[in-house]
Every structure is written in C-alpha cells, then in structure tokens.
Amino acid sequence: NFAMQAIDHIINSAAKTFYMSGGKINIPIVFRGPNGVASRVAAQHSQDYSAWYSHIPGLKVLSPYDCNDAKNLLKAAIKDPNPIIFLEHELMYNEKFELTTDKINIGEAQVAVEGKDLTIISYSRGVKMAIELSEKLKELNINAEVINLRTLKPIDKKTILDSVKKTSRAVVVEEGWSFCGVAAEVVSIIANEA
C-alpha cells in the first residue's frame, strides 16, 4: 500500500532493465506486500493493484490464496531471475490452512474445487469467497468448479479454458476495479478462446 512511493522504480527500473540492457541484466527481485481491502484503514491502504501491476511488461504478478500458495510461490519467486510482484491479502493472514508438500510453479492455476455446472475463477481472498459460494450452490444441486489463479501474470489460460469448456459457464470474482481489471482480462480470454 506504500508501494506507490516506489512505483517509478518498480515500473521504470525493475520491470524494464532486462529489455533496456538487451537481455544482459536480470533483475531478480521480489516486491512483497499487502493488496486488496483491509480492515480499519484509510482508502489509500485498502485497494487492489493486481491489474495495474499485471499491465506492466517485465513484471510477473503472484497472488496467493493459502499457505501452500504463499510458501511455494515465494520460494519460486526468489529463484526466478525476473522482477516479481507478490501480493498478499491482509485479511487472509490469520486464516488457518493445512500445509501440504504440493509443489507449485509460477504460471500454474489450481482447480481448488471440482465441478461440472459452473466455473468460478478468482485469486487471493476471492478464492475463499468462491469456495464458500460453491458450497452454497451445492444446496441447489449446482456443482461449481473453483479455479484459484495464483499467478495473474503469466496467467494459466489452459486451466481456465479447460474448465469453462467443461462447464460452459463462468463467473469471475475479484476485489479490484472492474474497468480493465483481472476479471475483464479473464472474461476476454474466455470470450476469445473458449
């Protein structure tokens, strides 16, 4: 949320150095910080910059949902030679999850809940809402599949498209602004490629 104080260095230095050096200089750095709505803070500390960072060539953007995503994606980010934005949702810090030994790679989404009637796609805290919604939909005999994007850039088109081809319906959940947002990009992928 104070990343805006460093945004020039993130966008114009870290993200562009590899290209400006003709591929000779890598910038292996991870910018890790809070993202999304927060509790009892001012407006400038409660917003979602996922789409904004995703617009920038040269940046990878990760947004974990649970402790497995956070642990594995952070390890992968540290090993990656590129600048990475690692967005954590403050309201998820106190959530309890079971830690597994699953390996997670940058660019791989997860089918968090299997389903056949509807695909719900989200990332970070939105996955929690999507899972809760899928449980309520079961009471109506609707089996929703939940996709945890994990990585916003590069985005896992295959997992999204495979699910939507199976269910023929999609809902995208995000906390960010709707205009030019992550949901708009996901819907564009579905409309153009499914």
Predicted features and spans:
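Conserved thiamine diphosphate
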Residues: G22-D80
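Glycine-rich, charged/polar anion/phosphate-binding loops
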Residues: K16, D69-L73, I104-E108
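Glycine- and acidic-residue-enriched helix-capping/beta->alpha junction motif
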Residues: A77, P81-P83, V186-I190
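Active-site nucleophile and cofactor-binding loops and adjacent substrate-binding regions
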Residues: N1-M4, S63-Y65, G176-C180
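Thiamine diphosphate
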Residues: N1-G22, K24-I27, A38-R40, E90-A194
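General beta-strand structural signal in soluble alpha/beta enzymes
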Residues: F31-G33, V61-Y65, I85-E88, V146-I147, ...
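Alpha-helical scaffold elements adjacent to nucleotide-binding pockets in ATP/GTP-utilizing enzyme cores
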Residues: A6-S13, D48, E185-I189
